């Protein structure tokens, strides 16, 4: 292990002890925000420091076994000590790899809720139907994770599915799990309306954006935001409102638009549309930085650009292929039912490998 990493881990142990003491301080306990922030930091540090302590103990065990094997004359004793050395070496290697991953830079947005947008692209009715299939897939996955999905806006297709559906997903680590879903999703299958049995290709675009706290963003000039109201039909065309409760917000300098029509209250719709507008403006800024400076995300996991084709769902072959990491899974039925864990884990591992490669090299 690099000396620089050992030094950082020792510093984290010191910080863990400091945070532990602070959590018992009456001033901290009386400050809810400070107590919550320190509790989160304590939780993250406890996992790393515990693993670091096990790593150091394994090093001690290996060293002790090596000294015993050097002094031993009995062949059976030497064999037993060698087995301990081999076991400790395997443990050390595995723990070092885990520590390297845990020490990678964290995306501060990983734990926040996210806005999930799905839009039908090329393919007409079939694209809209597939948008509905994708939304159902994410709904099933969200349910398996204990998350909540709230539909903010929906424009249904004429033959099912959605021309566009926008939702808010809340729960633990939502953005961190879904952030690599942004891009173009292509489907190859025989539409129900196809009498000749020919396979058609259509596509949908997915965008995943972190929900940004309004207090954490640059202030928007109210004069730069235009609000339009209109009557909402709600999801599925039901509960038609007789008042203009739906809200569309436009940020004039950037042209970014957000709308919400699911609440009966115009005030609630405006608040949710404002959250979405801020998230979109923030995402546009991030994308601009990616386009100009950050080559890392564009390597394997991708830029998150909606126009970038990231995945193909081939129904005749029962396969899903993610083109960014050359991963093909022959379990399409399960995937469409929300079984995304294997896929999302693979994307995160690839991203971690990218990060490790980008910061590798340094001192030994």
From Swiss-Prot:
The modification N5-methylglutamine is found at residue 238. InterPro entries: PCRF, Pep_chain_release_fac_I, Pep_chain_release_fac_I_sf, Prokaryotic/Mito_RF, RF-1. Methylated by PrmC. Methylation increases the termination efficiency of RF1. GO terms for molecular function: translation release factor activity, codon specific. Transmembrane segments: none annotated. Keywords: Cytoplasm, Methylation, Protein biosynthesis. GO terms for cellular component: cytoplasm. SMART domains: PCRF (SM00937). It is found in: Cytoplasm. It holds the Pfam family RF-1. HAMAP family: Rel_fac_1. Belongs to the prokaryotic/mitochondrial release factor family. Peptide chain release factor 1 directs the termination of translation in response to the peptide chain termination codons UAG and UAA. This is Peptide chain release factor 1. It comes from Psychrobacter sp. (strain PRwf-1). The lineage of its organism: Bacteria, Pseudomonadati, Pseudomonadota, Gammaproteobacteria, Moraxellales. The gene is prfA.
């Amino acid at each position: 292990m690099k000396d620089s990493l050992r030094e950082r881990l020792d510093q984290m142990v010191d910080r863990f002890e400091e945070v532990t003491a602070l959590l018992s301080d009456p001033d901290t306990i009386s400050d809810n925000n400070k107590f919550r922030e320190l509790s989160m930091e304590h939780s993250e540090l406890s996992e790393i420091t515990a693993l670091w302590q096990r790593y150091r103990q394994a090093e001690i065990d290996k060293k002790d076994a090596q000294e015993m094997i050097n002094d031993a004359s009995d062949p059976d004793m030497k064999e037993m000590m060698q087995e301990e050395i081999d076991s400790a070496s395997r443990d050390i290697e595995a723990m070092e790899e885990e520590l390297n991953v845990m020490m990678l830079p964290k995306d501060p947005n990983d734990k926040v809720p996210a806005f999930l947008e799905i839009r039908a692209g090329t393919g007409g009715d079939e694209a809209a139907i597939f948008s509905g299939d994708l939304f159902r897939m994410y709904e099933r996955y969200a349910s398996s994770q204990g998350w909540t999905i709230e539909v903010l806006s929906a424009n249904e297709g004429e033959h099912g599915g959605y021309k566009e559906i926008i939702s808010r997903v809340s729960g633990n680590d939502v953005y961190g799990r879904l952030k690599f879903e942004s891009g173009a999703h292509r489907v190859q299958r025989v539409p129900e309306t196809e009498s000749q049995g020919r396979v058609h290709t259509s596509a949908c675009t997915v965008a995943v954006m972190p929900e940004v706290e309004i207090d954490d963003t640059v202030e928007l000039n109210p004069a730069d935001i235009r609000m339009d109201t209109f009557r909402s039909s709600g999801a599925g065309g039901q509960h038609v409102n007789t008042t203009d409760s739906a809200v569309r917000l436009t940020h004039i300098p950037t042209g970014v638009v957000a709308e919400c029509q699911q609440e009966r209250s115009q005030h609630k719709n405006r608040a949710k549309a404002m959250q979405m507008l801020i998230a979109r403006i923030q995402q546009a800024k991030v994308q601009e930085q990616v386009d100009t400076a950050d080559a890392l995300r564009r390597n394997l996991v991708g830029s998150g650009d909606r126009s970038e084709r990231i995945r193909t769902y081939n129904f005749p072959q029962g396969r899903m292929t993610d083109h960014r990491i050359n991963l093909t899974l022959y379990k399409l039925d399960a995937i469409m039912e929300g079984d995304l864990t294997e896929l999302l884990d693979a994307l995160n591992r690839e991203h971690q490998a990218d990060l490790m490669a980008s910061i590798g090299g340094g001192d030994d």
